[in-house]
């Protein structure tokens, strides 16, 4: 969902499931609209199967937000992925935002399918997360992020259900916003740490052509049920690089020897981080 600052937002939720739900607009102030905060038995009655509820509020908080179900959060958010991004564009962006040529959202989550099955039998969570994803997909099925040399890329990072340590190869990140709010002093970072519910905006100047990976730096988050590589990994690919599909779903993509040898023959970038002085020298003045 994407709106502009000051818009009157009206969203009608129709419950076509067999469970009760509400929608919480995470990060919204809900000034004079507390009935739309989505907290069951506090601001509203839960929306039961077959019912509808309309949320109405003014988009008075700008930046990267998100929405999620607020009923039985460990199950509905943690296991059933009932969440999504909610972007409110400001009337007056900060100067560096005006340079952005490409905008992308990365939402991080994880789950354990065995626990999800036990929920249906009245079970409870407690087992470790075994699958990790970006925008609902695990590597090597994550959607590649394609850019052009010279792009100014903004990544909106959202930790939906788990801790994240995001790291892109081959490029600097300038951290400009936290939880939707612009920072008084943007700073460079090599790794961004997020806790569940946190959001960061980072800007990257795409000046290092090749094919690179970006991933969660928590080691087991880059696996699928213990098989690596997988999980929270995606490819950043520059326009003009030969577009073969080595990273699409293949059994051998789970083979570490393939990943660290065969993949490196597919163009510069993978595991080849050259020393460079940085993308934002103005911050060092």
Residue ranges and their predicted role:
Residues 102-147, 269:
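Acidic-aromatic/histidine active-site loop/patch
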Residues 51-57, 143-145, 153, 190-192, ...:
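Short strand-edge motifs at loop-to-beta-strand transitions and within beta-strands
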Residues 20-23, 113-118, 165-166, 245:
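Short, solvent-exposed loop/turn elements at domain surfaces
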Residues 146, 151-166:
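Long, repeat-rich segments with strong aromatic
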Residues 1-9, 140-152:
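Short, glycine/small-residue-enriched coil/turn segments at secondary-structure junctions
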Residues 76-114, 195, 201-285:
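Extended terminal and domain-junction accessory segments
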Residues 1-88, 163-193, 212-236:
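Histidine- and aromatic-enriched segments that form or immediately flank copper-ligand environments
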């Amino acid at each position: 969902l994407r709106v502009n600052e000051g818009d009157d937002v009206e969203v009608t939720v129709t419950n076509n499931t067999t469970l009760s739900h509400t929608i919480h607009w995470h990060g919204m102030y809900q000034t004079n609209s507390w009935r739309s905060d989505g907290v069951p038995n506090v601001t509203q009655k839960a929306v039961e199967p077959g019912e509808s509820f309309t949320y109405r509020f003014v988009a008075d908080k700008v930046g990267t937000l998100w929405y999620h179900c607020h009923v039985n959060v460990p199950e509905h958010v943690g296991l059933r992925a009932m969440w999504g991004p909610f972007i409110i564009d400001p009337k007056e962006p900060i100067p560096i935002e005006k340079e952005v040529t490409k905008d992308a959202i990365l939402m991080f989550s994880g789950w354990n399918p065995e626990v999800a099955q036990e929920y249906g039998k009245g079970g409870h969570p407690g087992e470790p997360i075994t699958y990790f994803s970006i925008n609902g997909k695990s590597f090597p099925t994550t959607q590649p992020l394609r850019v052009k040399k010279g792009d100014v890329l903004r990544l909106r990072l959202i930790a939906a259900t788990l801790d994240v340590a995001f790291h892109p190869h081959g490029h600097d990140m300038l951290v400009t916003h936290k939880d939707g709010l612009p920072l008084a002093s943007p700073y460079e970072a090599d790794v961004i740490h997020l806790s569940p519910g946190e959001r960061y905006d980072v800007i990257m100047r795409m000046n290092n052509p090749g094919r690179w990976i970006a991933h969660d730096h928590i080691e087991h988050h880059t696996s699928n049920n213990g098989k690596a590589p997988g999980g929270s990994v995606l490819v950043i690919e520059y326009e003009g690089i030969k577009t073969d599909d080595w990273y699409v779903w293949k059994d051998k993509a789970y083979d570490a020897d393939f990943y660290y040898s065969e993949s490196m023959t597919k163009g510069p970038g993978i595991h080849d981080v050259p020393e460079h002085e940085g993308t934002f020298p103005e911050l060092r003045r």
